[in-house]
Every structure is written in structure tokens, then in C-alpha cells.
Amino acid sequence: VRLVGSEMCIRDRVHDADFYDIDGNHSTVSMMYSEEYSFLKEEHAVGFIKPYKEGFDFVALLPDENMDIRDYISQMNGETFLKTIAQANDTIVQTGMPKFKAETQKELAEVLDRMGMHDAFDEKLADFSQMGNCKNGDNLYISRVLHRTKIEVNELGTKAGAATVVEVETMGCLEAVENVVLDRPFVYAIIDRENGIPVFIGAADAL
């Protein structure tokens, strides 16, 4: 999808800017400035939605300046997060977003077990007979699930895991009425636009 106004008055641009991390220390980052068209506001944060061509949206939420990112995350839940996105306002937003990369690795066996996936991790109860059997008669079961995620955000778009998404170009000449610059810790997510499900979510507390 490409949305182009009758006159191009604002282009994406990149400039050096300060970013203040979770401890208040500052570093110089490459800040990407752009104009977006969906403004998010909830009790303790503001943010924006940046659309991508492939049916995904980049979502950013910036907690209030006097609120620690850890406190903000601790009070988040899926219901309020999705409600905030669903209630986005069609408002022009002047945004600033730093280039960043993040990579995490997490063991998921315990998480999946708590979610109810018990038998698969039990060497006696697991049933993977449709996949095959051990020649010595031992049962197949899952001993470890390792989840690795990687995201890179720059002026060319966002690359998450093995999938690359490209921003939708949105241009217009209406007066901007909101301003959201991600110059301190923030929460970000990539959302499947069709069903509203987050496919990637994280927090940038230091760059």
C-alpha cells in the first residue's frame, strides 16, 4: 500500500540525537524522524503506529517521563495493550524513532509447560510416534525449547527474525497535532494487522 498526498512536504529524515537510558545516562543515536497517522494514548503512555506494506504495523509506546519503564511493563497485560492499539486515533503524529538492534534468547520449556503443554516434555507420556521411533525403543520427548529473536530497525524498514518488512510511505501536508520522540526507554511491537496479534514485542531500555 502506498499513500501519497498531493504535495510532498515532509520526508523521513535521520539526525543525531540524545537517548536517555533506564539509568538516566545518555548516548548519541541516529534518530529517524517521520510523520505517521495513528496516535496512541493510554493512562501512562503515548505512542504511534507505523504501517508496513506486508500487512504488519510497528507499534511504539513511550511511558510518561516520570514513570520507570520497568514499572510500566509490570502493569501491562495483553488485554489493555490490544485495547490501546484498537483505540488508535487518526491523528497526524510527528515521530522520532532511534535506529536499534536487539537480540534475545530464552528457554521456553518451562513457559510452555505452564501453558498446559505437559505431556510433550514427559519422557513417558510424550507421544511423537507419528514422527518416528528410536531404534532402541526409547520414547521421544522434548527436552528443550530455545527461542531466539532478533530485530533491527533502521531507515530501510524493520527486520525481525527471518522476515523483513518495509514501511508504507505516508505523506501529507496537514498540520501535525501530536509529537512522540522515542528518546528514552520505550515498548515496541510488530502487529499482524489482520488479526491484531503481536508477532514480536520488546522494550528498548538502553541503546
Regions found by a protein language model. Give the residues of each.
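Hydrophobic-core positions in well-structured secondary-structure elements of globular domains
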Residues: 6-7, 11-207
